[in-house]
């Protein structure tokens, strides 16, 4: 008789909590997307909680999570804990309006997408255009959720810009600082 060992993350999932606690890559994004879709299938009306403690990561992997968050009918409650940096910031900010939280000691990082690429001059030109397009799209998403302009988001994110919980609330990344 084989016994299945339940992990703490399985237990959290039973409570409709999805934990994003590392750098975002394709494997993690697939797991997060699958969990959100599973919770949506279980109950398309009950809130889904996405806790974020992430340094960011792959933009395309993060956009898969973002698109899944927008696709499901559930409200997505986001909670920033520790840090929500880069793509983690985009996901934190993309939670359902008025259901975006940050813990009092968490930090948020807004910055430009990072890229490392090589190849022929034509390849580099193509990749540079792609990352500039991604920068603009991420700025559009953040602007639509914060009430800022795309231009303001792009200017503020031109260099690493760290926010305290209070500053993140004031900027519009989140709606509430969670103290309890």
UniProtKB/Swiss-Prot annotation:
One of its GO terms (biological process) is protein quality control for misfolded or incompletely synthesized proteins. The keyword Nucleus does not apply. One of its GO terms (cellular component) is endopeptidase Clp complex. It comes from the Bacteria. Keywords: Cytoplasm, Hydrolase, Protease, Serine protease. Its EC number is 3.4.21.92. It catalyses: Hydrolysis of proteins to small peptides in the presence of ATP and magnesium. alpha-casein is the usual test substrate. In the absence of ATP, only oligopeptides shorter than five residues are hydrolyzed (such as succinyl-Leu-Tyr-|-NHMec, and Leu-Tyr-Leu-|-Tyr-Trp, in which cleavage of the -Tyr-|-Leu- and -Tyr-|-Trp bonds also occurs). PROSITE patterns: CLP_PROTEASE_HIS (PS00382). It is found in: Cytoplasm. InterPro entries: ClpP (IPR001907), ClpP/crotonase-like_dom_sf (IPR029045), ClpP/TepA (IPR023562), ClpP_His_AS (IPR033135). It is an enzyme of class 3 (hydrolase). GO terms for molecular function: ATP-dependent peptidase activity; ATPase binding; serine-type endopeptidase activity. Its main location: cytoplasm. The active site is at residues 86, 111. Belongs to the peptidase S14 family. Fourteen ClpP subunits assemble into 2 heptameric rings which stack back to back to give a disk-like structure with a central cavity, resembling the structure of eukaryotic proteasomes. Cleaves peptides in various proteins in a process that requires ATP hydrolysis. Has a chymotrypsin-like activity. Plays a major role in the degradation of misfolded proteins. This is ATP-dependent Clp protease proteolytic subunit 2. It comes from Tropheryma whipplei (strain Twist) (Whipple's bacillus). The gene is clpP2.
């Amino acid at each position: 008789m084989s016994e299945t060992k339940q992990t703490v993350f399985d237990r959290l999932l039973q409570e409709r909590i999805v934990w994003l606690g590392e750098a975002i890559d394709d494997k993690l994004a697939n797991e997060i997307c699958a969990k959100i879709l599973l919770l949506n299938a279980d109950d398309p009306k009950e809130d889904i909680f996405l806790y974020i403690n992430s340094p960011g990561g792959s933009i395309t992997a993060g956009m898969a999570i973002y698109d899944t968050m927008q696709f499901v009918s559930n409200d997505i409650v986001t909670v920033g804990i520790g840090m929500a940096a880069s793509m983690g910031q985009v996901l934190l900010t993309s939670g359902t309006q008025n259901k975006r939280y940050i813990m009092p000691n968490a930090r948020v990082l807004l910055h430009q997408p990072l890229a490392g690429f090589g190849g022929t001059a034509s390849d580099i030109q193509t990749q540079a255009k792609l990352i500039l397009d991604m920068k603009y799209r991420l700025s559009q998403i953040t602007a639509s959720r914060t009430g800022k302009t795309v231009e303001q988001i792009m200017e503020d994110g031109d260099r690493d810009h760290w926010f305290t919980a209070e500053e993140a609330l004031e900027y519009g990344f989140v709606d509430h600082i969670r103290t309890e």
